[in-house]
Amino acid sequence: MCTTKATIRMVLFTLISLVIVPSQLLILVFSKSSGAYILPQLWHKALCFVFGIKIKYIGKPHTDQQTIFVSNHLSYLDILVLGTTLRASYVAKKDVASWPVFGFLSKLQQTAFISRSHVDARKEKYALDTMIENKKSLIIFPEGTSTDGRIVIPFKSSLFSIALRKEQSNIMIQPVTLAMNRVNKHAVKTQDDHDLYAWHINMTTPLGEHLWRFARSKGAEIYIYFHAPVDSNEYSDRKILAKVCHEAVSNGLTNHNKTTKE
């Protein structure tokens, strides 16, 4: 039964992608404005439904102006989860671009790929600057990796410099907490529970195998906490700004865990 369900889900994943991808490619030829995020958002919503990912929203995303959404990171599935409500471009590590299927699909949401290579640094800085100048909102995962969702590790501050450049004076930063609430229709308790949704640095499971295992499950319930926006104009030090955002995201996870245990 689980294998049949997983097969149906993977077939639906393929069919939905085959419908949306050509249309999105055509749209991107003519426009990369806010309208170019509509189909990816529909794709994310459809796939969350197909894979049984239920999302609870606490708070509201800041959409009144250009915003950098700063979130903890548990899994490649976070892309779908956040994509259901945020019309923004992801900033991802360069190796994501080479992932089978997901690498290609991520480009359809105008993802900016970055690396630690000095050779690529200037080109990547130009790409990010262009996105900021074009008033695009961004989604970043400043932990620099993914975790099993138990804690939020310290943020790397480098990407926060985007919001502190003198020529950028009207960018808000909104901390966002992702928290697993339930997997397979029960509370998250064991490491296996965490690893059903999370795909993190301490795992050796290939992406495809992990997705298949998740497809065989009863899905997951994920909470998204949108915290109070932070005005980048009030900061001049990216490390302090990163620490402030980390505290908001980390406290959000701690409070969620306390609430669910009561």
Where are each of the predicted segments found?
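A transmembrane-helix-recognition feature enriched in membrane-embedded lipid enzymes
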Residues: M1-Y57, F104-L108, G219
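Catalytic core of membrane glycerolipid acyltransferases/transacylases, capturing the structured
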Residues: I20-F30, G35-A36, F49-V50, Q65-V119
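Short histidine/acidic/glycine/proline-rich micro-motifs that form metal-
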Residues: V29-S34, T145-D148, D231-S232
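Generic beta-sheet signal
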Residues: Q65-S71, K136-P142, I171
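A cross-family acyltransferase "interaction/gating" segment
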Residues: F102-G103, R150-S236
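Surface-exposed cleft-lining segments at the edges of enzyme active sites
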Residues: Q110-S117, D148-R150, D195-A198
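Soluble extracytoplasmic domains of inner/organellar membrane proteins
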Residues: L128, I132, K136-I140, G144-F155
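Membrane-proximal, solvent-exposed terminal domains/tails of membrane-associated proteins
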Residues: H227-D231, Y235-S236, I240-A242, S250-E262
